[in-house]
Amino acid sequence: MRNRISSFAPLAFAFTITHAAPPSAAPTRFEVSFAAAAHATPLTGRLILILSKTAQAEPRMLVSPQGPAVFGVDLDQLRPAQPAVVDNSAIGYPTSLADLPAGDYYAQAVIDVYTQVHRVDGHTIWVHMNDGRIETFQIAEGNLYSDVQRVHVGTGGTIKLSLTHVMPAQPREEDTEWVKHVSIQSQKLTQFWGRPIYVHATLLLPKGYAEHPNTYYPSVYTLGHGTPFQFSTTPGRNSGTISPITGTESGYDFYQQWITDSMPRLIAVSLEQQTPYFPDSYSVNSANNGPYGDAIVDEVMPALEQQFRIIRKPYARVLEGASTSGWQTLAMMLQHPDFFGGAYVLQPDPIDFRHYQQTNIYADSNAFSIPFGQFMSAERPFRRTTQGQVVWTMRQLSRFEAVLGSHGRSSYQLEAWEAVYGPVGPDGYPRPLWDKLTGKIDHEVAAYMRDHGFDLRDYAQRNWSTLGPKLVGKLHFFAGDMDDFYLNLAVYDFQEMLKSSQNPHYEAEFTFGRPMKGHSWHNWTWAGFARVAGAYVKANTPPGEATDWNY
């Protein structure tokens, strides 16, 4: 899933076409072009046409599985002023243009601009490249977009849109007394992609950091994307409250605790590591994304430990993450058990691919439907409410992603997993785990994912004789019993595997939020976790190691 902090995080209700109005009686086609003033040369990319029923916001800012209707077309060296056609042949979500109810809409078009890259593996591909900072196509620097235009669909004819605007660079946050920003070019990733690739870090410094120039501090890698613990020195509308959904406090309330004398002195670090396929690399080596795992452990973390006074020993490195970051946390702990001292894994993306949410990718033949009896089948859900109401299905999300990009370039969730876990296809792009329109599972891809260690339960079980002794005391799992994305199921699987572990027998710590705790549930406030992490490091500090950070 997307990390806990996201400008375009999914909302709670699915978009459903209601046929109060009949489908378009006459075919409507759109001709979309871009102005030479916006882009002077031919471009390759993905044209996304958005039709919204509301004028409350720009349609491009509403794109999501429960948002407006969207339609996608690939562009191959489209010239300025040359029209690209969006008609009934274009793939659409949640329906085709022909089946869209007739009526008035607010139309806007965006071009996600691609760059040709020559990877070290010999493949030449077209993908959206940036500097490694988190962004989505709606706001990505250099992408083109049109003005919003009110249109009528259903009476035929041609509607023309012109993309005249170029998205500017997003503002960068400035360093403060407490928060520092560092950009590190990875030589390993630069070699893989054939162009400079950066990983960006945001560090939260402890109270007294400047006044103790000879003190080195434990590190907590909170593997989200924003400032660690949502730290903010500015009061907000949620100040003074605890979120009933997450159980966490506001960033300002955390700041008020961070500066107290009772708070452990830690350096908290978050990372930005956007790839062409998703806003996060998952911090592992990948055939499609490149050696992000090696880059982070061998290049990024040592550079941070040198620039900031961070203890350079395993006992003082703690990992914490939720959702995407939860999977990262466990994967990094399993792959580098001698480098990290502990892992707090919250509602991770699937860590047992027998529960790839509700799909067993090894045994099931189709990701979209579950057969029952001789004639019946049910749709596989992707998301639910904490009361069990299904709001998205696998079929819906797969189609949505197919609209946003071909060849795995949607930068959305299902295709993110394929890019991280899966093999490179013959065309140089990620080979799909299943067909996006039929749901048929490719079991060769599933086997590749397992055999290359991305099914973390399978990886841990197969390597337990050497891995287990290095993990004892280090694993802490947390999940809501009604996780929105069914991620608790794979956590249960991992727990069962550990219950049967031998030599060593280690059951780890598992805490489940009950009753009806969803995907964003946390077992503690941010300040509460900082205290837990500090106490954990203190308890596991070897004799003779410096403890002057605990002032």
Feature roles, as predicted:
Residues 26-34, 41-48, 198-202:
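Contiguous beta-strand segments within globular domains
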Residues 37, 52-551:
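Non-catalytic cap/lid and distal C-terminal segments of serine-dependent acyl enzymes
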Residues 1-4:
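Positively charged n-region of N-terminal signal peptides that target proteins for export
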Residues 7-18:
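Bacterial N-terminal signal peptides
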